[in-house]
């Protein structure tokens, strides 16, 4: 426990909060070719690689992911949620924050039903999260 005198000489430092999705907090000025501090809820990007990944220890699956070059020129790995997708290399996608706990290095999700990404087909419940239209009838 520090004394009052020690605290007067050197006060306590406040904790620096680290962002869970740092690529969304950076903008890009293409005229000056400089990165700017400009937070956004989502960002647009181009898929440079689409593939599958195996999750961490207790789980077993082939999780779909895409490597995305964002509009601020940062390249990130994003998870493709839902069953089946239509993404290929050079597809334009929208990403949001949100990590996938069992995939190391995946801090972003691709928004289904936005830009080139189609919604999940034949989805009845939780449709808004997967860009699925309301079924007829």
Swiss-Prot record:
Protein origin, superkingdom: Bacteria
Keyword entries, A-Z: Ribonucleoprotein, Ribosomal protein, RNA-binding, rRNA-binding, tRNA-binding
Gene Ontology molecular functions: rRNA binding; structural constituent of ribosome; tRNA binding
Signal peptide stretch: none
GO biological process per UniProt: translation
GO terms for cellular component: small ribosomal subunit
CDD domains from the UniProt entry: Ribosomal_S12 (cd03368)
S-S bridge residues: none
PANTHER family noted in UniProt: 30S RIBOSOMAL PROTEIN S12 FAMILY MEMBER
Protein name: Small ribosomal subunit protein uS12
Annotated source species: Streptococcus pyogenes serotype M1
Underlying gene: rpsL
């Amino acid at each position: 426990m520090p004394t009052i005198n020690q605290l007067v000489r050197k006060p306590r430092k406040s904790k620096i909060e680290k962002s869970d999705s740092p690529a969304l907090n950076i903008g890009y000025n293409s005229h000056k070719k400089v990165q700017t501090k400009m937070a956004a809820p989502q960002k647009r990007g181009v898929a440079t690689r689409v593939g599958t990944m195996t999750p961490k220890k207790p789980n077993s699956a082939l999780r779909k992911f895409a490597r995305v070059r964002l509009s601020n020129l940062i390249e990130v790995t994003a998870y493709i949620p839902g069953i089946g997708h239509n993404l290929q290399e050079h597809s334009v996608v929208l990403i949001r924050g949100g990590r996938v706990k069992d995939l190391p290095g995946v801090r972003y999700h691709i928004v289904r039903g936005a830009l080139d990404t189609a919604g999940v087909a034949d989805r009845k419940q939780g449709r808004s999260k997967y860009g699925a239209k309301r079924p007829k009838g």
